[in-house]
Every structure is written in structure tokens, then in C-alpha cells.
Amino acid sequence: MEQAFADTDAFNQQLMRDGHWVFGGGLQPAGDAKVVDGQATDTVVTDGPYLESKELIGGFWVIEAPDLDTALRLAAAGSKACRGKVEVRAFEGTD
């Protein structure tokens, strides 16, 4: 795991050097999560992740890429660095 952290840090540095970095970060374990539901009159706060899943989000990147091919190439490099799957999505309203 220590090597994955080092490789991810190196990947982050490369994103910054190449001008793709916008924001990113690792997340605390899902067991430390709080779920907030403010839809009703009283806000309800519960412990734990909202979703039951074998795969949990350990972190994320927000990058800037000129096209989908570049984003996919960067995602593949990020996946290799962090030793996990990377999901690619554009922000709503972007091409």
C-alpha cells in the first residue's frame, strides 16, 4: 500500500507538471463516513457509507483534458498508480 501511495503522489506531480491537475485527494475510510439527509423538516445524520458496495471510492481527481482520449489515457495511468479502477466522467454541461 505504501508503494501505491508513492506512485499516486508521483502521478499527481506529473498531472501538475503537464497542466492537467485541477484538484484531487484521498478519502478517509468509508466506515468513517456520515450520511446527511436534509430533505425532510428534521435533518437526519447516520453513520457509514450510503451505498452497500464491494468497491468504495478511496479518492478522486478532477483533471483538465482537451478530449476524451486524453482523459482515458490519464485515467489508465492513474489506475496503474493507485492500483484501483478509475471512473471517467465529464462535468454536466461540458463537451
Describe the function of each predicted region:
Residues 1-95:
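Conserved, structured core segments of small domains
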